[in-house]
């Protein structure tokens, strides 16, 4: 369900400070974050974010097409390894 328009987009305050600081000094170092719920703002375009997937931080380069989406949409949290084949029991 989308967020109400009167509330506006959500971004974690600590993450916003890190992004503004990186843009101000033109730092190319990736920004590490656990805030998957934050919305991608136009200020973030061109930055690399290290987004936590529950186990490790995955690097994601932010492009213009990602603006308006959440950070967590671009990093999967579950790994699907497929179903195992049925093991037929051999009769002797």
From Swiss-Prot:
CC per GO annotation: cytoplasm; small ribosomal subunit
InterPro entries per UniProt: Ribosomal_uS19, Ribosomal_uS19_bac-type, Ribosomal_uS19_CS, Ribosomal_uS19_SF
GO biological process: ribosomal small subunit assembly; translation
Pfam family, one: Ribosomal_S19
Keyword annotations of the record: Ribonucleoprotein, Ribosomal protein, RNA-binding, rRNA-binding
A molecular-function term among this protein's GO annotations: rRNA binding
Stored PANTHER family: RIBOSOMAL PROTEIN S19P FAMILY MEMBER, SMALL RIBOSOMAL SUBUNIT PROTEIN US19M
Family per record: Belongs to the universal ribosomal protein uS19 family.
HAMAP family: Ribosomal_uS19 (MF_00531)
Function: Protein S19 forms a complex with S13 that binds strongly to the 16S ribosomal RNA.
NCBIfam families xrefs: rpsS_bact
The protein, known as: Small ribosomal subunit protein uS19
Organism: Buchnera aphidicola subsp. Baizongia pistaciae (strain Bp)
